[in-house]
């Protein structure tokens, strides 16, 4: 259980934020309920709220875990954009796929030969851009303290 005041996710247990938990159970809860969430409930939430809609099962086995972790941490649209950009890094400009955040047949086909390290590198670039390139974190210097953990996470999977 973590509840870092600088973490925009708020109270989190088993990687599930309070907002995601509340959406899953259909009611507002207190932090104590998040703290007491069991692992089985977290697994059920991951499966229903993230795995099923992500279409991760249609991607190559090599990138599934990293992609799924990105879906959990960046939302599906953000994760798909990172995936699409990683795919485009291997393609000629006249053969790029749209970086639109939608995981359709073109993205799934383009990811066919993607290596996990290629996706991890693109993801780490995403984090650096978030913190250091005038993004939504520009006025949130408190987020800088998370960059090392985010980058480590990129390459753990």
Question: What is the role of each PLM region?
Answer:
Residues 1-157:
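Cell-wall polysaccharide-cleaving catalytic domain and substrate-binding groove, primarily
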């Amino acid at each position: 259980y973590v509840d870092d005041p600088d973490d925009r996710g708020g109270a989190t247990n088993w990687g599930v934020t309070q907002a995601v938990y509340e959406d899953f159970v259909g009611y507002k809860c207190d932090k104590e309920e998040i703290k007491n969430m069991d692992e089985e409930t977290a697994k059920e939430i991951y499966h229903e709220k993230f795995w099923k809609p992500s279409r991760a099962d249609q991607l190559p086995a090599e990138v599934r875990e990293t992609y799924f972790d990105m879906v959990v941490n960046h939302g599906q649209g953000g994760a798909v954009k990172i995936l699409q950009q990683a795919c485009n890094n291997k393609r000629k400009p006249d053969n790029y796929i749209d970086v639109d955040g939608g995981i359709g047949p073109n993205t799934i086909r383009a990811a066919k030969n993607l290596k996990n390290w290629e996706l991890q590198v693109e993801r780490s670039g995403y984090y650096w851009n978030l913190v250091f390139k005038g993004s939504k974190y520009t006025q949130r210097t408190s987020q800088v303290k998370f960059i090392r953990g985010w980058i480590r996470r990129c390459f753990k999977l």
